[in-house]
A protein has these predicted regions:
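Mid-to-C-terminal alpha-helical segments outside catalytic/metal-binding sites
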Residues: 364, 368-392
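Boundary/entry segment of secreted carbohydrate-active catalytic domains
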Residues: 47-85, 318
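Sec-dependent bacterial lipoprotein signal peptides
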Residues: 1-20
Length: 392
């Protein structure tokens, strides 16, 4: 078979213009010419990243008109849940756009097939997200069995075998009710296996990362799971661990020559992108990680600065509540606001406790003009398009 990465055939692209691992748990983290040639499957569509049928809307205008400001803002939040009751409560009461299944989540929500119960509490399609890379970053190994780390995969498997492994894992995730996987990790790294990225990276060779990560993302897509590549603009050569504090990458020009190549090659293949909590000399302001940096999001969106096509898909933050690169400087409400202002479409954090307070804060930010209404509307439509909730 042959895997082909078709850049134009994505659900998200139809609404153009309009995501360290995302677990926050210390130590666990959470041009297509280089596409693999050993398998043959065409991307003819991108799976809708939600757990229920789409709602009718025309390029987002009908959807936007049907939502209050608070409902719009809630669609831009994705939070970790402890189990079914917690998930149903936050979805029903606050109408958030997504839930995150972490290592602390009661697995009975998955094994008892209770995700549809959660999704039915939502008026709009619900993103059900997970951080399932394989190796040490796996949330369902006890249910579906272990998969190898990215590095072990590239060292022991062919590209075709990687595609088949991802296809099987994706089908397993879909059967459990998952719709979005914050994987594959496309960081380019030669770090030791047990470092923050380490064996989560396929290789220190960018083209090897493109081939294997591309095959993994393709397998997820073909299984009906929406893949999210990470951690933009590249964590593989950074100093430090964003779970524990500030992280600085090599200068932007160095990233363009290596770390950004997988993003350039894969961002147009029907994926989302997760922003890393990374300070980048020559790109971000001091003290402002890429996840909340307008300049970093603009680099991704425009593409021009690193030779990529414009990116019109959904942009996610890494965890904003459990990683000290953010929490040492920002309260969760301020961090979410900063991310949305910067151009991110959906903010991720690990508990439901602060959702009402964050929504209150964001409503005030819109009222004061600090968070433009147009930015909110753009993000709502981008997220809705990724869920298949708008047709454009």
């Amino acid at each position: 078979m042959r895997i082909k990465f078709l850049k134009a055939a994505t659900t998200i692209a139809l609404c153009g213009g309009l995501v360290a691992g995302c677990s926050g748990e210390n130590g666990t983290a959470d041009p297509v010419s280089s596409a693999p040639t050993s398998t043959s499957t065409e991307i003819t569509s991108t799976p809708a990243a939600s757990s229920s049928a789409p709602v009718a809307a025309s390029c987002g205008s009908d959807l936007l008109a049907s939502l209050s400001l608070r409902q719009k803002l809630a669609q831009l939040l994705n939070v970790g849940v402890t189990g079914t009751d917690d998930a149903v409560s936050i979805v029903q009461n606050e109408e958030i756009g997504g839930i995150f299944v972490g290592s602390w989540t009661d697995q009975s929500m998955l094994t008892n097939r209770e995700v549809p119960q959660v999704a039915s509490a939502s008026k709009l399609p619900l993103m059900v997200t997970i951080d399932e890379e394989g190796g040490r970053v796996s949330r369902v190994a006890d249910i579906l069995g272990p998969d190898p780390s990215a590095r072990e995969t590239a060292q022991t498997m062919t590209v075709e075998q990687t595609y088949q492994m991802a296809l099987e894992r994706g089908r397993g995730l879909k059967d459990l009710g998952i719709t979005v996987n914050y994987a594959p990790d496309v960081d380019v790294s030669s770090q030791p296996d047990d470092s923050v990225i380490g064996d989560r990276s396929y290789s220190d060779d960018p083209q090897t990362v493109v081939a294997y990560a591309g095959a993994y993302a393709q397998g997820m897509r073909d299984a009906g799971i929406f893949p999210v590549i990470k951690h933009f603009p590249g964590h593989g050569s950074a100093s430090g661990d964003s779970h524990r504090g500030e992280v600085t990458t090599p200068p932007l020009q160095d990233l363009i020559a290596s770390d950004l190549i997988p993003f350039r090659e894969l961002s147009g293949t029907g994926v989302g992108v997760m922003m890393g909590h990374l300070e980048v000399p020559g790109l971000t302001e001091p003290g402002t990680p890429a996840s909340i940096s307008p300049a970093a999001v603009a680099l991704l969106r425009d593409g021009v600065g690193y030779g990529a096509a414009p990116f019109t898909g959904p942009v996610f933050t890494d965890d904003l509540s459990g990683m000290q690169a953010i929490t040492d400087r920002y309260d969760i409400a301020d961090a979410v606001q900063a991310a949305l202002v910067a151009g991110v479409d959906q903010a991720l954090w690990l508990t439901t406790d602060d959702v009402p307070r964050v929504l209150d804060h964001l409503e005030q930010a819109v009222a004061s003009g600090e968070l433009p209404q147009t930015r909110v509307d753009q993000a709502v439509v981008t997220v809705a398009a990724a869920k298949g909730a708008v047709t454009c």
